[in-house]
Amino acid sequence: MKRSDKYTDDYIEQRYESQRPHYNTYYQPIGKPPKKKKSKRIFLKAIITILILLIIFFGVMYFISSRANVDDLKSIENKSDFVATENMPNYVKGAFISMEDERFYKHHGFDIKGTTRALFSTISDRDVQGGSTITQQVVKNYYYDNERSFTRKIKELFVARKVEKQYSKNQILSFYMNNIYYGDNQYTVEGAANHYFGVTVDKNNSNMSQISVLQSAILASKVNAPSVYDVNDMSNNYINRVKTNLEKMKQQNFISESQYQEAMSQLGN
């Protein structure tokens, strides 16, 4: 082979090699961006921290509320004008249950459905009843009346459960109706009935006239704002609350259709 031929072949081979595609045979792992991993870890740590704080918070609230002696509620029965619910006409009890806690006999101190319904009523301007159950209100009025805070609501829940375990529903309702403010320095349903209408809620008391369906609805509708609602000069808002209460009493079978119609005619609006 001629030397010139060799150079020619080498040139052709080099040119061929330069035109061939080259592939990277080394494995290069592609990882996730480090920022994503870091943000995920931060998020998980935040969730775990929040859960731990909530557990600690509710644990502390439970400990504090466990110190409340629910035996003390029995002292309400020592009031001179205390009347137990079993000695009242059924419609008197019904007036308060319908207005304040219509699921009273179905829950165990806290009512998720009732709270949700109350929230909806507030949003839609149909404020018919509060979000707290009657049991919670018993606890608030007796133990935490002067306390206004979110933690009070949590303590209420725990103490309300204790109250429900120790007392019957009728006892709890008696505590409620005999330890709330009706206005004009009246704190029992018997005292309020005597003061405003000259009647009694005690069906065994033959010395006074018995409270009527309408009068029961008026008192039950008053406790939401006792200093605002005036029995002797009823505002339109107060009248509408009484009407709503009477309707609910009928729906829940605390009064008959004829009792409802009679009360509505006596209301006269």
Curated annotation (Swiss-Prot):
Annotated Gene3D superfamilies: Biosynthetic peptidoglycan transglycosylase-like
Bilayer-spanning residue ranges: 46-66
InterPro entries in the cross-refs: Glyco_trans_51 (IPR001264), Glycosyltr_51/Transpeptidase (IPR050396), Lysozyme-like_dom_sf (IPR023346), Monofunct_glyco_trans (IPR022978), PBP_transglycosylase (IPR036950)
Gene: mgt
The protein's Enzyme Commission number: 2.4.99.28
MF terms (GO), sorted A to Z: peptidoglycan glycosyltransferase activity
Organism: Staphylococcus epidermidis (strain ATCC 35984 / DSM 28319 / BCRC 17069 / CCUG 31568 / BM 3577 / RP62A)
Function field: Peptidoglycan polymerase that catalyzes glycan chain elongation using lipid-linked disaccharide-pentapeptide as the substrate.
UniProt family annotation: Belongs to the glycosyltransferase 51 family.
Lineage of producing organism: Bacteria, Bacillati, Bacillota, Bacilli, Bacillales
Name under which the protein is recorded: Monofunctional glycosyltransferase
PANTHER family, alphabetized: BINDING PROTEIN TRANSPEPTIDASE, PUTATIVE-RELATED, PENICILLIN-BINDING PROTEIN 2A
Reaction(s) the record says it catalyses: [GlcNAc-(1->4)-Mur2Ac(oyl-L-Ala-gamma-D-Glu-L-Lys-D-Ala-D-Ala)](n)-di-trans,octa-cis-undecaprenyl diphosphate + beta-D-GlcNAc-(1->4)-Mur2Ac(oyl-L-Ala-gamma-D-Glu-L-Lys-D-Ala-D-Ala)-di-trans,octa-cis-undecaprenyl diphosphate = [GlcNAc-(1->4)-Mur2Ac(oyl-L-Ala-gamma-D-Glu-L-Lys-D-Ala-D-Ala)](n+1)-di-trans,octa-cis-undecaprenyl diphosphate + di-trans,octa-cis-undecaprenyl diphosphate + H(+)
GO cellular component entries: outer membrane-bounded periplasmic space; plasma membrane
Gene Ontology BP annotations: cell wall organization; peptidoglycan biosynthetic process; regulation of cell shape
UniProt topology in membrane: Single-pass membrane protein
Pathway: Cell wall biogenesis; peptidoglycan biosynthesis
Alphabetized SUPFAM superfamilies for the sequence: Lysozyme-like (SSF53955)
Subcellular location: Cell membrane
Keyword entries, A-Z: Cell membrane, Cell shape, Cell wall biogenesis/degradation, Glycosyltransferase, Membrane, Peptidoglycan synthesis, Transferase, Transmembrane, Transmembrane helix
